[in-house]
Amino acid sequence: MTHCFIRALLRQPVERTPVWMMRQAGRYLPEYREVRERAGSFMNLCTSPELACEVTLQPLERYRLDAAILFSDILTVPDAMGLGLEFVEGEGPRFRNPIRGAADIHRLGVPDPEAELAYVPAAVRLIKQRLGDRAPLIGFSGSPWTLATYMVEGGSSREFRKVKCLMYEEPALMHELLEKLADAVALYLNAQIAAGVDAVMVFDTWGGNLDTEHYLAFSLRYAERVRQQLRLTGRGRIPAIFFTKGGGQWLEAMADAGYDALGLDWTTDIGSARQRVGDRVALQGNLDPVALYARPEIIRGEVRKILERYGRGSGHVFNLGHGVTPDIKPEHVGAMIEAVHEFSPAFHRT
């Protein structure tokens, strides 16, 4: 029987609401920190199929999760395009060769996932071998817009001055960059699908920093271009999830982009979101990650509220509204997951 995570994404009947977490394999887990130290660097961890497999499976050994998500980083794609990714302690990701003009964009090529990114499909194959039928595996990529923000800014940014200036002053150049990125992302996700992932997710972390006109033209347009190129049939139906952090105001437009499910951050009421999108897409989310700092009984209450707001029936995957933070207590994560298991069956009884 198809796993409840896949059925929920396809809005098919389920016996309970499935649950997983963005960044579920991460620094809040002591076992992850041990492997990270053994790896020597974050990039070593990402590029070693054996280590990536180990940390991908860690949260499933600890919790009753309904999906594993490939351990990797969204910036592996621009790294394979020649930008030279490095992670600086206390500073985050940084590119040695950021985009600084038209010539940099013109010379960008679309990387071959089985060559420049071969460690990713290799990790997928290894994870699937060891995961077996325990849970589906999610593959992922950053969205074209989100990848472009890092590539033009040279790393993380709060104001996005450089990338927005390029968008306003040289829109044709920005479109050229985003077209290449959309094709690269689609190729990358298709390689993950061919290697065995059961679902894919596109993370548009920074789309919510745009106004409506520019979100539709420079973010959602290229997420849709990615979706149009995805090969989602073959080994059964492969659901695709799209998540724009801060994108609640554009749900109706996002629901028309062709994805099976939309991720919600915690600023959008999931009940009203369900009314707005109707039966076009499933919804994923959307507990505030900061709620996990609260006492377990508070966490349980917040879980119940979200389940009640969504209401009865399938089409909901429980998740956080963004990634789990590094200093969360693992037992608080467990309280959230167990609350979903305990409370959600009541919303699926006929």
Swiss-Prot record:
Keyword Transport: no
Record-given protein name: Uroporphyrinogen decarboxylase
Pathways per UniProt: Porphyrin-containing compound metabolism; protoporphyrin-IX biosynthesis; coproporphyrinogen-III from 5-aminolevulinate: step 4/4
Originating species: Methylococcus capsulatus (strain ATCC 33009 / NCIMB 11132 / Bath)
Site (Transition state stabilizer): D73
Entry keyword Cytoplasm: yes
Segments traversing the membrane: none
GO molecular function: uroporphyrinogen decarboxylase activity
Binding site for substrate: R23, Q24, A25, G26, R27, D73, Y150, T205, H322
Compartment(s) of residence: Cytoplasm
Superkingdom as given in the UniProt entry: Bacteria
Family designation: Belongs to the uroporphyrinogen decarboxylase family.
InterPro entries per record: UROD/MetE-like_sf, Uroporphyrinogen_deCO2ase_HemE, Uroporphyrinogen_deCOase
Cellular component terms (Gene Ontology): cytosol
EC number from the UniProt entry: 4.1.1.37
Assembly and interaction partners: Homodimer.
Alphabetical list of HAMAP family matching this protein: URO_D (MF_00218)
Catalytic activity entry: uroporphyrinogen III + 4 H(+) = coproporphyrinogen III + 4 CO2
Pfam family, one: URO-D
A biological process term (GO) from this entry: protoporphyrinogen IX biosynthetic process from glutamate
Keyword tags: Cytoplasm, Decarboxylase, Lyase, Porphyrin biosynthesis
